[in-house]
Amino acid sequence: MKISPEIKSPNMKLSKVYSILFLVATLTLTSCGIYKFNDASIDPAVKTIKLGFIENRARYVNPQLSPKLNDKWQLKIASQTKLTRTTSDDAHYIISGTITNYDASQTVGVSNQQASTNRLTVTVHIVFRNTLSNKTEEFDVSRSFDFDANLTLTQAEARLLDEMVRSLTDDMFNRIFSNW
């Protein structure tokens, strides 16, 4: 006697496909709750943030740095946290800052009695106040950017501005929100 193969209806096949898709979607969505795409660790009680303007008070002022740094800083906070911006002094986090150093210098490496690279060092002083815990922390974020000694400072600034802004905002964010 011959055993006939099991005949599957199209509805059964479709049902299996839907079951597999449902399982994959469920696993994907639940795994997103376990892993974060950024390292920001913010107390769930913190809901609001006030960002003060980062003013340039360095001896030499690059007129483009402060506005670009402020714009990038605000965008980073908005895109990588769920905090609501406010202008109120009773915000849960209050962050202000000042560019305190913007200095070009020659590096030690010398070729034919002339420095082969120069270095631009930028320092931002940050005041971070957590009004929920009534704690204030002050710290400096400093970065150095090397550039070819054949370039003028103006040329180097034009080439380095985006990198300076990105690096400084990343360092500020990591220091405040990622406990670095």
Listing of model-derived features with the role each one plays in the protein:
Residues 19-30:
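Bacterial N-terminal signal peptides
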Residues 158-180:
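Compositionally biased, intrinsically disordered linkers/stalks adjacent to structured regions
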Residues 4-21:
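Bacterial N-terminal signal peptides that target proteins for export
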Residues 1:
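Tryptophan-rich substrate-binding surfaces of secreted polymer-degrading and adhesive proteins
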Residues 37, 44, 79-84, 89-90, ...:
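Surface-exposed short loop/turn segments
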Residues 30-82, 90, 132, 142, ...:
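A structural "domain/chain start" motif
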